[in-house]
Amino acid sequence: MKKGILGRKHGMTQIFDEKGEVIPVTVIEAGPCVVVQKKTVETDGYNAIQVGFGDVKEKRLTKPLIGHFKKAGVPFKRYLREFRLDDISGYEVGSEIKVDIFKPGDRVNVTGISKGKGFAGVVKRYGANRGPMSHGSKYHRRVGSMSATTDPGRTFKGKIMPGHMGHERVTIQNLEVVKVDPELNLLLVKGSVPGPKGSLLIIKDSVKSK
């Protein structure tokens, strides 16, 4: 990984390219982020930078976090995330990371927390086949067979079952950057990204773009 930034999802819209074709895009408020800490191989065993995003009041933070920000001499930030980079020599504590690190045509991976759907059955959660819907059937949208009887005498790990759906960390890979607006700190990527409006997103350069 060579570059990354934190952002906030604003929603989806559509724009037109030079040929007049419609492109569905997600609008992301990306940055500005501030470098709060640098980690090196000598002190931490790996190279990384810790960045903060989104202003927050001091009363919303714990005392350890308040001390962490004051030691770095940077404003209080709501979100703290770490990026492992190959080379961190170009970053200093207190420096800003802005959306202009990306340009149209770049490929990025976008990570977020998907929308929570609550408790769901296997049909909605995994797309399982239904049972017979006719009269006399005792299962329509139930799990069906979960295991054998005496042997093995248990249900194997990984068997699809009803449970909590959504609210998981999801990464969409290799999305194309369509437009960058440095003045408004906006990043437009082609397609959809995880999470509801206003949720935190982690944008990194794609490793599969080559």
Curated annotation (Swiss-Prot):
Keywords: Ribonucleoprotein, Ribosomal protein, RNA-binding, rRNA-binding. InterPro entries: Ribosomal_uL3 (IPR000597), Ribosomal_uL3_bac/org-type (IPR019927), Ribosomal_uL3_CS (IPR019926), Transl_B-barrel_sf (IPR009000). One of its GO terms (molecular function) is rRNA binding. It comes from the Bacteria. One of its GO terms (cellular component) is cytosolic large ribosomal subunit. Residues 131-155 are annotated as: Disordered. One of its GO terms (biological process) is translation. NCBIfam families: L3_bact. Belongs to the universal ribosomal protein uL3 family. One of the primary rRNA binding proteins, it binds directly near the 3'-end of the 23S rRNA, where it nucleates assembly of the 50S subunit. Part of the 50S ribosomal subunit. Forms a cluster with proteins L14 and L19. This is Large ribosomal subunit protein uL3. The lineage of its organism: Bacteria, Bacillati, Bacillota, Clostridia, Thermoanaerobacterales.
